[in-house]
Amino acid sequence: MRIKVLSGGRKSIELPLSDAELNFQMKRIGIEEIVPVCRLVEASEKDNPLCKFEGQTVKMDEVNFFAKRLDCFTEYERKVLYSYVTDYGVGTMQDLINLTFSMKGLSLITDFSDVEQVGKRLYLDEFIAIPEEEKQQTNFIKFAEKTFKESRVEVLPYGVFVEHGFEMQEVYNGKTFPEYFASDEIVAAIEVQNQAGDTEYLSLIHI
């Protein structure tokens, strides 16, 4: 994703970046702090949840971590994420990051032509996977009817948003990013903790 940030001068940055690359880009616009802070001017994609934070001051390490998470999402997952942010809102970058770890039980239905497929979509979003034996035994039409009846349903301009079994997880506490690795180059991780109990994860990368 491409974003524009402001700190003395406006600059476009392509995310996600490695920690070293992010620090380099921040120094190019005069930011030397360990935790770089900028004003988010613009997120290029119109359906990017970061649009909700345009005009606000953000921690760039949080924005970069979110970009890493979003980079691994499918197109469908991105649409569900954007729908939740648009319809319900998120107050902080911490909330947005935690939402990326809490997608279970959120669905966006845009095609009702095949009710059985709708049921399968809802089932997958709630239970993550469908074992073959369970797939043969489940009546997905009835499951869809039950889910729509018992869940929070919102009709949006681009589809029907369904909240069923969703629970926001606090994976990121605002200080230590969760143990999450998207790169195939990482071969091991070390967890370190200081006397105050704060945890950091150090990655060992194969070169």
Residue ranges and their predicted role:
Residues I205-I207:
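Conserved small/polar residues in nucleotide/adenosyl-binding loops
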Residues R39, Y82-S83, G159:
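Short coil/turn segments at secondary-structure boundaries
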Residues K46-S151:
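Charged, alpha-helical interface segments at or near domain boundaries
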Residues G119-D198:
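Acidic, proline/glycine-rich low-complexity IDRs
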Residues M1-K4, I186-A188:
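Short structural boundary motif marking the start of a folded domain
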Residues G9-L70:
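N-terminal interaction modules that seed assembly of large macromolecular complexes
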Residues L6-R10, Q195-D198:
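Glycine-centered tight beta-turn/hairpin loop motif at sheet-sheet or coil-to-beta transitions
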